[in-house]
Amino acid sequence: MSRFIVFAFIVAMCIAHSLAAPAPEALEASVIRQKRLTCDLLSFEAKGFAANHSLCAAHCLAIGRKGGACQNGVCVCRR
């Protein structure tokens, strides 16, 4: 009886492990970079106030980086 319980536990752990692993397609799709709105559409200047670099820096701070700046319309975050 104890062998059956151990075998059932091992099978259950293998099934749980296979269900918890991410699908390979999901890993590849997350690598694709998409353009950010902070440097393209939200770049504006009004009465001497330019919001392009500050919005990019805020975006980078929100994802845990140490700030950032716009370079050729792309937000580049510092490490």
UniProtKB/Swiss-Prot annotation:
The UniProt keyword set, sorted, is: Antibiotic, Antimicrobial, Defensin, Disulfide bond, Immunity, Innate immunity, Secreted, Signal
Q: Please name the PROSITE patterns in this protein's record.
A: INVERT_DEFENSINS
The protein's location, in the record's own words, is: Secreted
Read off the Pfam families from this record: Defensin_2
Query: What does the record list as GO biological process?
Result: defense response to bacterium; humoral immune response; innate immune response
Which cellular component, as a GO term, is one annotated location?
Answer: extracellular space
Q: In which tissues is it expressed?
A: Fat body, hemocytes, malpighian tubules and midgut.
Cystine bridges: which residues? Answer: C39-C70, C56-C75, C60-C77
Explain the induction of this protein.
By bacterial infection in fat body, hemocytes and malpighian tubules.
Q: Which residues form the signal peptide?
A: 1-19
**Propeptide stretch(es), residue numbers:** 20-36
Q: Which InterPro entries match?
A: Defensin_insect, Defensin_invertebrate/fungal, Scorpion_toxin-like, Scorpion_toxin-like_sf
Query: What family is reported?
Result: Belongs to the invertebrate defensin family. Type 1 subfamily.
Q: Give a short account of what the protein does.
A: Shows very strong activity against S.aureus.
What is the name of this protein? Answer: Defensin
Source organism of the structure? Oryctes rhinoceros (Coconut rhinoceros beetle)
